């Protein structure tokens, strides 16, 4: 069973790790597109409704995505047809439930939208841990940046964040 709960040091999880792109779309998506091309990345996983919608809208189709259909801007992802399947899970704020972890395990294989009832934010860590080599995990930072994580470059360091999670 794989379940984690954020119990302490929330400040560490709000930090804009490691590549913060402080540009609005479509420029932010173009920067990631260039990073993918220049770095030889094969997989892109998006976490969050706004980021996923922007990637889809500007033609950078994620390998898989996680959304919760709740944004400050009222934006919804409606192009689920870009993916083979939709997996619905329950994942409360501050958690990575066993059900959500299993869905991310399927999602890293490609073509999956993980549709979360609750909150999808913490699933970025599951994607970072489970993504295959040559992957990027992208999500939105609460202050407006697009965060892009080349997993091969930063996985070891970012997995230290699991030390601040409690098993549940």
From Swiss-Prot:
EC number: 2.7.1.237
Pfam families: DUF359
Highest rank taxon of the organism: Archaea
Key words of the record: Coenzyme A biosynthesis, GTP-binding, Kinase, Nucleotide-binding, Transferase
Any single biological process term in GO: coenzyme A biosynthetic process
Keyword check for Ribosomal protein: no
Listed name of the protein: GTP-dependent dephospho-CoA kinase
Organism phylogeny: Archaea, Thermoproteota, Thermoprotei, Thermoproteales, Thermoproteaceae
């Amino acid at each position: 069973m794989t379940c984690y709960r954020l119990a302490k040091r929330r400040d560490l999880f709000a930090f804009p790790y490691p590549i913060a792109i402080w540009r609005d779309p479509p420029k932010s998506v173009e920067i990631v597109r260039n990073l993918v091309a220049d770095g030889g990345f094969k997989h892109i996983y998006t976490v969050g409704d706004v980021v996923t919608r922007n990637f889809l809208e500007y033609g950078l189709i994620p390998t898989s995505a996680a959304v919760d259909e709740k944004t400050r801007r009222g934006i919804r992802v409606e192009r689920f047809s870009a993916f083979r399947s939709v997996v619905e899970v329950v994942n409360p704020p501050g958690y990575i439930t066993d059900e959500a972890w299993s869905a991310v395990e399927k999602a890293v294989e490609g073509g999956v939208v993980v549709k979360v009832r609750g909150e999808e934010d913490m699933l970025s860590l599951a994607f970072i841990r489970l993504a295959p080599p040559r992957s990027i995990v992208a999500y939105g930072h609460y202050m407006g940046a697009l965060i892009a994580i080349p997993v091969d470059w930063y996985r070891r360091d970012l997995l230290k964040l699991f030390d601040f999670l409690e098993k549940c």
